[in-house]
Amino acid sequence: MKFLLTVLTALAFSQTALAAPSCYTQAEAVAEQAIRIHSELMDIGLNCQHMTPSGQKNLYQSYREFTAQHSGLFAAYENTLLGYFQRTGAKNPEAALNTMRTEFANKISLDSAKMRPDLFCGHYMPRIQRVSTMGQSDIQKWASTFFPGHPTTRPVCGQK
């Protein structure tokens, strides 16, 4: 009986050690925020491109240029999240990342569906215009700023 208890205890501890926590590291939380921001900008650019003010660059084109200019930064954020999904045992980390992006885009699409297009675009369009002038450090600072209305989908390890 004592042997069985020892084996079961050892097994329990080994399973605990093998199980990766599902909470985010700080870097993973920042990466999620960055991917959420990027997904929202895409949706804004697509939904509001027809309302681009006269004489200004098409909003979706501005979004695409912003993406190209900062592709390395967003690729690094994606790699961080792929690492999270691998660490937590996702069968297909890339599919998990794509699902996350889709869920973020769907949320802003639902917000846009609840508003008249002119009101939605009037409210969100300035984001595209603002990011077109941002440098990498500005984007990193934005992604590192957590807002109560936009919590991460998972808790950050060690935070309550």
Please report, for each region that a protein language model flagged, where it lies by residue.
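Compact alpha-helical subdomains of small soluble proteins
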Residues: 22, 63-160
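Cleaved targeting-peptide boundary
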Residues: 19-25
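Early exported N-terminus immediately downstream of N-terminal targeting peptides
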Residues: 30-73
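N-terminal signal peptide c-region/cleavage motif recognized by signal peptidases
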Residues: 14-17
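Positively charged n-region of N-terminal signal peptides that target proteins for export
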Residues: 1-4
